[in-house]
Structure formats: structure tokens, C-alpha cells
């Protein structure tokens, strides 16, 4: 179990600026009594768009009577953000962890909410020329069938799932056919 008092290092790396929000990237290193260490980065920002429902997570702060709550993006919003980046940059994308995140999140996604997010953040975005789910699938297939892209994903060591890269890309494509 990780405790708040076991956070070894918290540092603000840099400001981030996306179209939909501005914020800070925070690097956190958490360790436990067994010398297990978890390093992660967290983007903290404020969205301009209040139409999308955020999920509230509450953390018990051991040394205070109060708790801390944060609002996080829904898995549908996370998938949409990752898809949008993949579509925008294609095989040039260096966000290799995203294909594994999409694979994991695909089991949790509500398809109606996902379609709403895709409509709002991908189809309505005039900076990328994507108007339907067929185009999303075509682009994803082109990217995932690229031997160069597959090799880069393999070498990235961003695979946090107990699946091969081939299995993950196949599952991601199957998921995209359900949109």
C-alpha cells in the first residue's frame, strides 16, 4: 500500500499547453516499506470545456482529517485524446504508450460516451481532416501495419501490459471497429 508520507520526490517539470487546457506536468516518485518504487508523471490542468463529465477521485491524506479530491478525465476522453494524437501524427507519433493505454481502456469504455467525445474532439476539429469512424480506422490500420512504427513501439519499452505488441495493435483495431 502506498502512503502519502512515502512520496520521495515531487517536482514540476514544465508547463504544458494543449488546445483544450493549460497546466503543469508533475513527476512523482512513490516508494513503500519494501523498497518498491513507482515513478509517474501527472499532467494537471484546467479544461475550458465543461460539457464532458469528469470523474472524481478522493484520496485520504493520512496526516489530516480532510481528504483531497481531484477530477480526472473519463476513460472515453482519454481514449479520444490518444486517438486524436495518433491520427494527427501518424507513424511519426512518439507517444508509444498510448497504444497500450487504449488497449487497456477499451475494456472500460462506454461506447456512446466515446462516440460523443470523438464527435466533439476529433470530427469537430478543423485542424485534422477526419469526419467519420471509417477514416479513423483507415488511418489506424495504416499506422499499425507500418513495420517501422511497430519496431518503434517494440523498442520503446512502454509496454506495461502482459500482451505482445501484435496482440495490442490487433485489439486496438478490433476496438476501433466497434466505434
Task: Pin down the residues of each PLM region.
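Structured mid-to-C-terminal alpha-helical surface segments
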Residues: 1-179
Amino acid at each position: 500500500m502506498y502512503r502519502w508520507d512515502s512520496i520521495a520526490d515531487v517536482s514540476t517539470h514544465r508547463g504544458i499547453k494543449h488546445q483544450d487546457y493549460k497546466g503543469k506536468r508533475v513527476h512523482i516518485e512513490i516508494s513503500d516499506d519494501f523498497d518498491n518504487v513507482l515513478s509517474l508523471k501527472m499532467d494537471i490542468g484546467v479544461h475550458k470545456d465543461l460539457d464532458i463529465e469528469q470523474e472524481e477521485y478522493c484520496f485520504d491524506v493520512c496526516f489530516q482529517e480532510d481528504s483531497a479530491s481531484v477530477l480526472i478525465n473519463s476513460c472515453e476522453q482519454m481514449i479520444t485524446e490518444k486517438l486524436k494524437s495518433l491520427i494527427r501524427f501518424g507513424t511519426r507519433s512518439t507517444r508509444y504508450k498510448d497504444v497500450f493505454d487504449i488497449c487497456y481502456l477499451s475494456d472500460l469504455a462506454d461506447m456512446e460516451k466515446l462516440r460523443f467525445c470523438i464527435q466533439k474532439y476529433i470530427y469537430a476539429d478543423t485542424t485534422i481532416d477526419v469526419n467519420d469512424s471509417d477514416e479513423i480506422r483507415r488511418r489506424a490500420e495504416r499506422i499499425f501495419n507500418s513495420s517501422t512504427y511497430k519496431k518503434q513501439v517494440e523498442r520503446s519499452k512502454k509496454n506495461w501490459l502482459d500482451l505482445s505488441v501484435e496482440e495490442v495493435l490487433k485489439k486496438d483495431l478490433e476496438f476501433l471497429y466497434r466505434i
